[in-house]
């Protein structure tokens, strides 16, 4: 059995981790899709605060991502891909259930995210390598998992600190065509636990951080538009990142601020 490991090099619903460099023949190119359920920089203000009474919450988010280059593990554009244009439009549908049960003072619940992904990709006609996308709207990988949310710490009559822990599983349940290089689904299982905290230093300021870890399991049926040797497997490396936000209340119930993330891959 041949096993190939790749480095995840981009943030988004689809991230292309390619083992091919400039010297790699087109017939040998293999792509690894980053799991479609991970949250890179999408965390909003007051991240650790939420619903603490039993019930169901539905939220929807829209994202548009565009890539104009495919990079190697050093962050350099791979020259065999000319005039790269890859676009993903994503609708994230999140369902949150808060149970009536408690543990260690926190509220127990569960969460699921169902992404709908619209993919499109094009390359120059004379590009030495042109990746094939699973075009059109398709279901991405479903993310689900339990969480424990701790009610905010109250000081001076107002909340000053809150935290939540969640253990997410990303299931390869989305649309996946092994004859296409780019798919809504990654084609493999992943686990993505995180811990999020929100600090309220003053009545008008907010700071939040979500600390994430990602472990990707082996893909025994890697997708590729070119034939692969029998028994070929792929595996994206483990990674960690932190989403962060900072905001200020400019009007009652209206905060303005910034958000971002720092991403680090630990293994290839």
Question: Language-model segments: what does each one mean?
Answer:
Residues 1-35:
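Cleavable N-terminal export/targeting peptides
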Residues 30-36, 64-90, 125, 130-134, ...:
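Surface-exposed strand-loop-strand hairpins of Gram-negative outer-membrane beta-barrel proteins
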Residues 31-32, 46-55, 67, 100-108, ...:
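Short loop/turn motifs that connect adjacent beta-strands in outer-membrane beta-barrel proteins
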Residues 34, 63, 77-79, 221-268:
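Outer membrane beta-barrel transmembrane domains
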Residues 36, 56-66, 110-116, 163-171, ...:
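Transmembrane beta-barrel strands of outer-membrane/channel proteins
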Residues 43, 55, 86-94, 139-145, ...:
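Transmembrane beta-barrel architecture of outer-membrane proteins
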Residues 47-48, 60, 92-99, 144-150, ...:
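Residues on the lipid-exposed face of transmembrane beta-strands in outer-membrane beta-barrel proteins
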Residues 106-109, 115-235:
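Outer-membrane pore/translocation modules
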């Amino acid at each position: 059995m041949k096993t190939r490991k790749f480095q995840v090099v981009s943030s988004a619903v689809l991230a292309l981790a390619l083992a091919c460099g400039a010297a790699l023949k087109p017939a040998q190119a293999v792509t690894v899709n980053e799991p479609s359920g991970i949250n890179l920089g999408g965390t909003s203000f007051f991240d650790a605060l939420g619903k603490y009474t039993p019930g169901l919450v539905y939220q929807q988010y829209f994202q548009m991502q565009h890539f104009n280059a495919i990079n190697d593990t050093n962050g350099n554009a791979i020259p065999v891909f000319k005039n790269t244009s890859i676009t993903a439009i994503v609708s994230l549908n999140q369902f949150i259930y808060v149970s009536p049960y408690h543990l260690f003072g926190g509220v127990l619940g569960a969460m699921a995210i169902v992404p709908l992904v619209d993919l499109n990709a094009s390359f120059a006609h004379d590009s030495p390598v042109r990746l094939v996308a699973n075009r059109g709207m398709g279901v991405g990988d479903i993310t689900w998992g339990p969480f424990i949310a701790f009610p905010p710490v109250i000081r001076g009559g107002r909340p000053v600190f809150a935290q939540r822990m969640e253990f997410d599983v990303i299931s390869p349940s989305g649309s996946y065509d092994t004859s296409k290089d780019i798919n809504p689904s990654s084609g493999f299982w992943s686990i993505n636990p995180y811990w999020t905290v929100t600090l309220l230093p003053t009545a008008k300021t907010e700071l939040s951080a979500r600390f994430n870890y990602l472990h990707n399991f082996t893909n025994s049926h890697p997708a590729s538009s070119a034939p692969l040797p029998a028994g070929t497997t792929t595996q994206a490396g483990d990674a960690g990142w932190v989403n962060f936000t900072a905001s200020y209340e400019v009007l009652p119930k209206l905060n303005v601020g910034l958000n971002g993330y720092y991403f680090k891959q630990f293994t290839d």
